[in-house]
Amino acid sequence: MTTDQKYQQIYRVGGMLDAGFVGQITYTISLDQVYDELDIHFSFDKRLYSESDVTPELIDKLQTLCTAKYDAPTYPVEEFRQTILHEMKTEIHTMAELNDDFIGCIHRQLTDRHMLYTKEFTSDGCLAQDTFSGVLKVTVLVFNVLLDNTQYTLTVSGHPVGQGVIAPNFNLMDTVKTGVENVEASDAISAADPALSARAVTVPTHFKRLELHNHTVESDGSLTCEELTEYLAADHVDAFAITDHNTTSGQAKIEKLLEEKHYPIELIHGMEYTTYFGHILCLNLTKYVPWNSIDQH
């Protein structure tokens, strides 16, 4: 993905992470003018182990660690080797704030990602903004690094207000789920109820049908907000929670859908935090709060 030449580079930085690093790296950028479109581009290498990385010594080290820390059984060497190759990963995500207000987080297993804000489009996981001015903070959220010398690059580009109409050369397929990727999800929705009508279902008044943990493409789910809402309407739930990883961007979208389509469903606002000590599922959360300051709110 490349930006159009009329997007001005505002900030660019690179860095290197070594194996085992866990932490947050925040870059603070004072915007020199007002922008009406913004692209926050982050990429890194070495997401997975290569064949040559998985040596007998590494296999033995990880097997010993799993047994000691998690009381895991001893696996056959080849099975464990395949697990290391295909299931272990470097996990890095990105979050942005504008003047200390949360404006988005992309929680997906991508080595190259764009947090893109234009007049017509905002990347999944991000909150649309009219303009950008003041102080932008981009936080690199590092949850696991497999290999030494893992390189990353962060580039912020934008279109200043008043510099004419633009047509940025973005391949949006890099940042959003495609229709092809959602075919199975759409088929599942149709199978549940082809008419997608929210018919009333007689149930005891003391019993409610709830779905309290749901992800969408706003983080690492496979359904769009609309697909999830229609699926649950067809399934006659009384209420459901939207709990995407580390972002509240889907809440307003689902609220709008429920209002437009008059579905008799209650939305429970929430979010699933990814922390360095596991995940936290929070309900009745309408505004993004950093996980490490939850106890202050």
Cite the ranges covered by each PLM segment.
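Acidic, Ser/Thr/Pro
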Residues: 1-210
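A metal-dependent hydrolase metal-coordination microenvironment
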Residues: 201-297
